[in-house]
Structure formats: structure tokens, C-alpha cells
């Protein structure tokens, strides 16, 4: 670096050896280079790229040294490769019978639910619809003339509840279960055959995205364990690439992932050798079952103890990173301050003696965060500085583990080694750390923007045709889950599958699941039912995407090829195709001309030629094999057994270019390409856009669970989580992503399901009103009906019994427990009177006044702490929030109303027992649903926080004053009361 130049203009690329032959326990990683964008002022243009190789640990394996400068110019047209340079040509040999050998395979199947259960389920739905219609008609025809206001409020609420129930229930008419055949997948893609004599894997590549944004709320140890579980999955190593998106640009996360890359050289071969499950070390070593069960190898006990000791040391290093980085930075900053002071003294002497004028040097050095090599961390500093804050920092790309070779690399064996890895493949998948550039004045679009940056960077570096995204706290629990997802993509008609959604499963939740954190009703009933229509919604994590679907292209049509068509069947720009009336032989693209409108593609994807050229390659590699059962175009067997192109500095430099903050300007990213912007629930909108184009999705339930994660189990965090989801739904309702405006390719029942997503928060208005009706009824002495007639009771009985019957049948075909169903019902009312109501208000404010809504990141749980012995200590953590005021008011009001009504009826000369019975039952129904909320207010061991007593007292005083005012008005002949 030349003197006087800004350090921001010299990017560096990270690099760590992926050899894995030695297993050092040092916390230092071998070598790394950090790459920063060449445009610190956000002005895209040519810049020089300085490559610096840093020697960190001489005991680790050496990496070939690369030094020098790479000059990366702007992507002008003169230097752009033509799109035809990456055209996939099968060649003249495609007519050969060997290449066109047709394979008949089925990788998935439908597991039918009992026809009797489904028939009864649909009959009960019809019965309940009819009974609701008759009941509402009867209610309208029989008003309560003594309390019309009470009758009118109740009827309006009941009409909305019936409408809301229909929106939720109708999409559940066609539930299905899908199963995969992993053995058939292996036989088709990884078994020697005439087209693949060596039996090398013909499976497509997968790019795995792991996202994190705050090292304080998302502990680096949790993220590191997630990375380790991904690196050790049962999928071809050379076909797997892992990207960690650190949107906070934290050095703690950076070094934690580097530590994980080093520990992976021990952990991954150990898992492969002994078939460890789960492959998250924290979860595996924390299992309460016998770890030696079914382990027959004589060396397992010894090697497990060695790996456990190595993991404990790894945990200590990772947990100590914040302190060690702070201590290191303080030491370097002290040296810099001494240098600055000496420079200032030298300047002062020079000015006094020579009487010359020179710029005064800075007396105080910046409080920088330092890397272990003695350079400034280019991301966010602990003490924010210019170009080093959370919203203003450079890009960083670090290749922690190199792309592996195609041939297995066996470890070393023999006595005296801690791990005998003879015959074990010790290769590791490629691992890349990415932190996109952020600058003031640019909208970074939160998680959606970070995901789109990963999509572009991964397209250039590995270009896997499929993308799996995981939150940092969701780890791989089933090492074969990736194969389960690929079964759907590679099956017949798999080319129309946009994504495969896995259910979210959670750990660390209290056995009773007090606040319905498992959300099993949504994951095992709603999403499973949508699987029988057009597919489940995308829920933000645990989802395997087809890259071309994420790019915004339409699904392929069924057609036959005419006149040497070119390009890809996925893209609407292809000409000369006609519908196929009968199933025809699969054909391959072999033309010599390209009919892509490059200008349009470039407008959508940006100026990067590498990115544009990668689109066709990803589409081709993501096709299922050509089979006799498919009328669509497939890829030839054995076409993905070749070697992957190694990474070079020019490629990584281009990856840095596409994650710059200015790259998305005047492109379709976030609007029609990638994750969609404009909502805090970008996941639902992104999946909706795919379904709107006609894509299909599948729901993949595996045994054991594919992924597991953590969920907030205390009441406050749970309410804030639900608030975020509900706010996103309100945003969807008031946007163009409302299902009402969707195109004709979205099926009717799927449209209703998406419409319900946008409407359900508005039910909170009617829930809140309905919860206040019992105390109003008890205080006034009237009920929602004038008298409890037989017709009313019969209708009520039929509606209640039909609901219970539907619940039992849903439990039968979904596999959830009745307790989980009931917990969901309880939290539906708790959330409806708190978070959903606030979400509606926030959404309306955003639409009318343009008030932006911001949310804090939900804290992820970590190991250790003051209550280390109590697994559910967080459950009793009480943090007051204004969201608790409406439910607390409802509880107090209903309890007071019951006591008041009982006393009044008992001491009344003309007691109205029917009204008391109806009102008390009504209020008890509300209180029964509020029980988990009330229990949460009690804290641990029934110790109610003081703030609850304060608010209860205030509410009681307000109610007393209101009652006195009403009584005085009634005595004076006023008309204050509505009764």
C-alpha cells in the first residue's frame, strides 16, 4: 500500500487451507485475506486490488503464496463476455443411445391420509358452515330489544368470526403427506451406469445461506454450531457451498466462524466415520440419551472423548472472543495513541524551531477494532468510527475453506493418532464469510437485502442451482435432509417446483408449550393442507429454493422443441415453441444461436457479466434428468460429474462488486428478482410472488426433523415476535401483494390462504370487542340474547361440538396433540387482544401517515448464564411491555364483572339467573383462554412483579370511577348508560 492512500481502496481476500490432514488445536486460523470494495465513496468504477497474504500460524499447513496486484476495471461492454460463451452444448453425441438413455425413477410419493378421516373432516366442515349460517340468520332475526347495542356488537363480531373461520378452514380441505425415497435418489444419481461409469455424484449443487445480524443478540457460538452442522451433512462435498451473511459486520462473528472452520477439520470427519446424529456438537454432546448406544467401533469411546475435549476448548475460545478482541484492540489503540502523541510533539518542536507551517497531526487516534494480524477490521468497530459503524462499513468477503476437489481425500490412520481417519473422506465444503457494504443514504432493506447480496455473490463464486437458507439459530438436525429436499426438485415435474419448505421445529421450549411457541397448528395443519393445493408458504428459514425461481422467472411450460430452440425453457424470452398435445421424447438444447435479450437481463440483474452469464448455467444444472415420463426438457445423465472451476482472485473481486451498496440501483433486485422488499415479512411475499407466477412448492416433513432452532419462550419476546409477523401481514394487505390482486395462475384455495395471511390481524378488533362483551353484559344485567331459548342453545351446542370434532380430526391427520391445538386457541385470543391489535394500528399509520416501522432483533438463546441448571429459566423472565395492558384489562374486568353480577343476583329481589349464567359462562370462556397470560404474569413461583399490581390498581380505580359516574348519571335521570 502506498503512503497516503486510503486503506479502503485496497481489498484483501480471505483464504484458509481446506486440506484437513492435520488437526491443530490452536485458535489461530491458517491464513486469511479480507476483501473490501474498491469504491469507498460508493462510486462504481475501476480500482486497484491489492493482494496481501498473511502468515498467522506456522504450525498449520502451508497454503500456496499468492502476491501481487490485480487491477479490476469497470465492466464495460468491450470487456464483457457474450452470453453465448456460457451456453450449454450437449454436442453431436447427443443422438447416441448411451447419452439419451432414459431413466425411469420416482423420488417422491404421496402418502394418503385415511379416506374415512378426510371424509368425516369435510362433512363436519359442511355441517359447521350450515349451522353457522343458520345461527347467524337466527341471531339477526331475533334481536335483543332490551339491549340493542349489546346485540348489535355481538352480531357484528360473530359475522366477522364466521368469515375469518371460513378463510382459515377452506384451504384445509385437501391435506396430503409427501414422502421421499433417498435410496432411489442415490441409485439414480450416484450409482455407476453407462453415462456415469465412475459413479461420481450427478447431483446438483446447493448453496447454503446462513444469516446473522447482531453478535450480541445472536451468540456467535450458536452460529458456529449451525455452520458445523451444515459442513457435516450427508451430501456430496464438492456440490456444497456454505455462505454466512454477517449483516452487522462484526469481528466477533468473523473470528468465531474462522474458529469453526478450524474445528470442522476434527468434527466433520468424526461425524462421517461414526455416523453421528445430530451433527451440531452442542446438541450432540448435550443429548440425555446414551451416546454409546448402537456404536460398535472399538475406537469410538476414545475418539469421542478427544473430540469432546477439543469442542470444550473451541467453546472457550469462541466465548472469549469479545474479551480477547477488546483486549487486543485496546493494546493496539494504546500504541497508536503513543505514536500520535509522539508525532504531535515532533510537529510542535518543528514548528517552534523552524517556524514553518505544516498541517497539525491528530492528537487522538481512533478507537479502532483490530484484527489479529495488526490491521484495522474493515467492518463495524466496537466504538463506531467513520466508515466503521453498523450502517456505514465496507464489504468483506472471506473464503475460509477452499472449494474441495472432486476426488475423495482419505485421512491418515495408524496407532498413536487421536483420530484414526483411514478410509474417511476428510474434505470440507467451501465456506465463505460475507458482509455486504453499507453506506449512509442507501436503503439496505434488512434481511431481504442481505439475502439478495448472498444470491449475487454465490452466483459468481459457486452458482449452485439450489439455495437453502437458514437462520443462524436453526441447525441441521437430520444430516440427510438436503437429499430429501433434492428429491422433490429432481423428481418428475420437479422443474416446476420453486421451493421445498421444511417445518420449523424448536428446542428449549417448556413441556406444556405455554405460549404456543412450537406453532404446530400452523406447521403441521395449515402448511400440510396447502401442500395439497399449490404448496406451502415460505416461512423464512429451512427452505430449499430453485435459483431460477428466486430470479423471478416463470415456471417452464409443457412444449416440444421446434427449429433448434436455444437457451432455457424456464425463460419467457424464448421464441418458437408450441404446446405439446401428447407426451413427446425429451430433447436437448443444441442450437448455435442465442435468443436472449441481453439488455433486458442486464437491466434486471445489473451490470455484472459474470452474474448474467451464470443464469443459464444455473437453470441447466437445476433440471431433472431426461426421462420417458416427462414431456419437458431435462438434462443428460452424467452432465454434472465434471470438475468445478477453482476460485481465482478476479472471481472473488467480482463477487465483492455485486455486494456493493450501489449495485442494485436501477435493477429489479427486491422488486421482481430475489427476496422481495417492502415488508417486514419478506418471506411470505417472496413465496407469494413465486406462486403467483404458477410455481409449485412442496412441504417436506422428515423423520427425524430436518432442522431445529430456538424460539423465545418468555411472554414478552413471544408477543413482540407475533407483533412483527402481524405487522408484516397488515403491510401485505395494504400493498400490491394482496392476494386479491394476484394473477390467474394462483389457484383459488391458495389465494384464499394468502388472503387470510393479510386479513387475520384485523380479527383482533372484533376479538377485543367480544372480550369486553361479558363484563358489559354482567354489569348491565343483560345478555347478547334476550332470553336463553332452546334454539340458541341448540345452535351453540352444534357449533361447539362441530368445532371439537374438527379439532379431533385435525389432530388425527396432522399428528399433533390435542394440547397443542388448545394452546394455539388460547394464544390466538392472547395475541389477538395485544400484538395483533397494535399491528393493525401500526399498519394503518404507515399507510396513512407514512410512519416507518422498526423492530429489534429477537435475542437468541445461548448456553450458560446465571440459571444454567434451569433449562427453562427464560420462561419466567418478565419484561413489562405496553402490549400487556389490553389483556390485563380484560382479565381484571371479567373477574370484577363476575363478582359484581353474582353479588347483585344473590341479593336481588328479582334475580335474573339466566342472564347471570349466560354472562358468567361467557366471561369464564374468556378467562380460560387468558390463563397462560395470567400465569406468565405470576413469574417464577407465583411471584407477581410489582408493575402488574400497579397497573391492576390503576385499572381498578378507573373502573370504579366509571361505575360511580354511570350510577350518578342514572340517579340524576341522565342518559349516560347505553342500557
Swiss-Prot record:
GO MF term set: cellulose synthase (UDP-forming) activity
Biased composition, class Low complexity, residue ranges: 14-24
UniProt EC number: 2.4.1.-
Family: Belongs to the glycosyltransferase 2 family. Plant cellulose synthase-like D subfamily.
Gene transcribed to yield this protein: CSLD6
Annotated segments matching region Disordered: 1-24
Keywords annotated in UniProt: Cell wall biogenesis/degradation, Glycosyltransferase, Golgi apparatus, Membrane, Transferase, Transmembrane, Transmembrane helix
Protein name (record): Putative cellulose synthase-like protein D6
The organism's taxonomic lineage, starting at the top: Eukaryota, Viridiplantae, Streptophyta, Embryophyta, Tracheophyta
GO cellular component, one term: Golgi membrane
UniProt-annotated catalytic positions: 247, 683
Localization, UniProt: Golgi apparatus membrane
One BP term from GO: cell wall organization
Coiled coil start-end: none
TM helices/strands, residue ranges: 116-136, 147-167, 765-785, 788-808, 837-857, 882-902, 913-933, 946-966
